[in-house]
Amino acid sequence: MRRPGAAERFGMKILQINTVYGEGSTGGIVRDLHDLCADRGIACVSAYRGPAKGRTAPEDTVAVSSVWDGRIHGQWSRFTMFKGTGSLLKTARFLRWVDGYAPDVIHLHNLHGSYINLPLLFEYIKKRGIPVVWTLHDCWAFTAICPHFAMIGCEKWKSGCRDCPQKKRFSSAPVDLSGPVWRAKKAWFTGVPQLTVVTPSRWLGRLAGESFLGAYPRETIPNGVDLDIFTGTESDFRARYALEGKKLVLGVAFAWTDAKGLDVFQALARRLPEDYRIVLVGTDDRVDRTLPPRILSIHKTADRRQLAEIY
């Protein structure tokens, strides 16, 4: 595990915590914020569940968990519904490191990747009184087990989850423990002395305000865009895929499901005129098997310049 070093010569020290680093949507956001801090002379360390087997952690990052610990924690979470209650030893070790680093601000992101013990983490934060910014990328922080509920119109999270309609999707537990899980999360996540909730949209901010996180101050900060990459870009994308003269409808997601609107694009493909084509980025072989011919599928990519060419 990385020890405090030369970067800490600067004044403010920030610690970010997220499931992943440098991959996927939230991992890219964490990496970009990490790099922005470095450019501005602010010390920043990003903690995440750890690199995949055979890979090494990037500089100025900390692996909270390990591959095997994550698997055990994940299975425990699936069968008990209590995500974030494993990884006791790994989290205790990580928090000893945090004491040595002594961050001025902790920036939380996604905590639901079966890599960190949430009761230990929040007990530590409350005792130390460290200011916290918590950026919510979905709704998991204020529900029992689900990251999204709009599809099914569930509002039980406002007063207390119970009889979870998405239990089979997110848990293998033999009984529904969504009520105790929701109450536990409320106890863990409330009562932090200095915590600000940040959301990338007003919609998510409104939902957070209606939840048990509503007592905290909230800010809406849209996700940033790297204008050095996402700018006017020469591209042969249309010619490469025989799309010249077509009107394009573009959809981009890290993992396509009906919750991300996959079913809407499938229905749209059947209704649009012939001079339209739909392009979905972030697909995989499983999604490909469900797509009609008029949808162009482009598999997941971590190459932001390729994305800029498509845009």
Ranges and model annotations:
Residues E8-M12, E234-V249:
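Nucleotide-sugar donor-binding and catalytic loop/hinge architecture
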Residues K126-K127, W140, K156-V197, R206, ...:
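Membrane-proximal helix-turn-helix segments that form the acceptor-binding/catalytic region
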Residues D39-V105:
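A conserved catalytic-core segment of Leloir-type glycosyltransferases
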Residues R206-G209, V225-R240, D288-T290:
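Acidic anion/phosphate-binding donor-loop and adjacent secondary structure
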Residues R96-I116, I130-H137:
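Short N-terminal targeting/anchoring amphipathic segment
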Residues V198, A242-K260, Q266-R270:
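Conserved donor-binding/catalytic core segment of Leloir-type glycosyltransferases
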Residues E8-E59, K126-I130, Q266-P273:
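N-terminal subdomain of nucleotide-sugar transferases
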Residues Y276, G282-A308:
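Nucleotide-activated donor-binding/catalytic signature segment of Leloir-type glycosyltransferases, i.e.
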